[in-house]
Amino acid sequence: SSPVPSTIQFVLEPDSLRERVRVFFLQYWDLIVLEDSVLVKLKTLFRTAYNFFNRIRLKNTDVTLIASNCNGCCILHDLGLKFNSPFVNLWVEPSDFIKLCKNLKDYLQYDLVFITPAEKEITYPVALLKDIKLYFQHYSSEEEASLAWNRRKGRINFDNLYFLFTDRDGCTKQNLLDFDQLNLKHKAVLCHKPYPDIESAVYIKGFESESCVGMCMRYRSRFSIRKYYDDFDYVAWFNQT
């Protein structure tokens, strides 16, 4: 038998069911692929509109967001805000993040000291800031991480601080309680289930069967323009000056 062609062909009067099925897929496969391409473009278009209206709602635009992982920089990017914080494209372990939030100014007086991580699977830069570890997961080199850190550290607005935490990365209930008790004007923690006893907890739906929230910056589904962290009204939160 002849090989299946890679482009659409029209076969007149196919003489078997097998031939009819083959012709059908040859005719419509490109359309199926195109559908995915169109879907991505439509999602991008509608997400851009969603972000546009959020930017109109936003009144407080000189925010410094101290975040424990990449949710922070993704939210800032959606809102078109400058990264006025060095906590971008990195993550911090829960207990370390709580120490950092409690004594932010003190920790920021120290220089980064890059170390070789004990975990062999970690191939990105890791640094100590005094006694806490910073995992620069989305940086290719220590130099790149250091330059970005120092540049953004100089933009911090200590009069407009917001602290964003999640229940990921081994976070315990005690970590959540400790974070909730910090004397911070603006703090929130994204959680996989409701915590009525934790005032700063924000319930993110969709992770109830998990032990923590997943990647909150991802879209909820193939067809949705909403990301998981959109359950949190971060615009209203930032506007609470």
Segments predicted by a language model, with ranges:
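Short, hydrophobic beta-strand segments that form beta-sheet elements in well-ordered domains
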Residues: 164, 185-192
